[in-house]
């Protein structure tokens, strides 16, 4: 699996932006990816050193369209902590 297949996109929220100041970044990742896969993909894609990873499975919300009820897909979120002093330049401009 390529690192492009593992990392879907960064999480965009106030909590995620607050973590960027401390070197903690959040990403939506493939539900099948392991912590080892995520670590190697982040290091390869952004050329940084990953110190720790926390992952969580986020259940999809139930949504209604008229009288029909559907459900969004379940997703996996990875919270990645980088080595001291390192940042991901591509995401710093968004904060």
UniProtKB/Swiss-Prot annotation:
HAMAP family assigned to the protein according to its UniProt record, in alphabetical order: Ribosomal_uL23_B
Keyword Cell cycle: no
InterPro entries reported in the protein's UniProt record: Nucleotide-bd_a/b_plait_sf (IPR012677), Ribosomal_uL23-like (IPR013025), Ribosomal_uL23/eL15/eS24_sf (IPR012678), Ribosomal_uL23_CS (IPR001014)
Keyword terms, alphabetized: Ribonucleoprotein, Ribosomal protein, RNA-binding, rRNA-binding
Cited PROSITE patterns: RIBOSOMAL_L23 (PS00050)
Record bears the keyword RNA-binding: yes
Quaternary structure, from the entry: Part of the 50S ribosomal subunit. Contacts protein L29, and trigger factor when it is bound to the ribosome.
Function in brief: One of the early assembly proteins it binds 23S rRNA. One of the proteins that surrounds the polypeptide exit tunnel on the outside of the ribosome. Forms the main docking site for trigger factor binding to the ribosome.
Cellular component, GO, one term: ribosome
Family under the similarity heading: Belongs to the universal ribosomal protein uL23 family.
Name of protein: Large ribosomal subunit protein uL23
Biological process annotations from GO: translation
GO molecular function: rRNA binding; structural constituent of ribosome
């Amino acid at each position: 699996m390529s690192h492009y297949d593992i990392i879907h996109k960064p999480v965009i929220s106030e909590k995620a932006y607050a973590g960027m100041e401390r070197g903690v970044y959040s990403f939506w990742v493939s539900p099948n990816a392991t912590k080892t896969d995520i670590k190697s993909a982040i290091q390869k894609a952004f050329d940084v050193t990953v110190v720790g990873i926390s992952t969580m499975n986020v259940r999809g919300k139930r949504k209604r369209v008229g009288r029909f009820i559907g459900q969004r897909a379940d997703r996996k979120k990875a919270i990645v902590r980088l080595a001291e002093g390192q940042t991901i330049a591509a995401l710093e401009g968004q904060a």
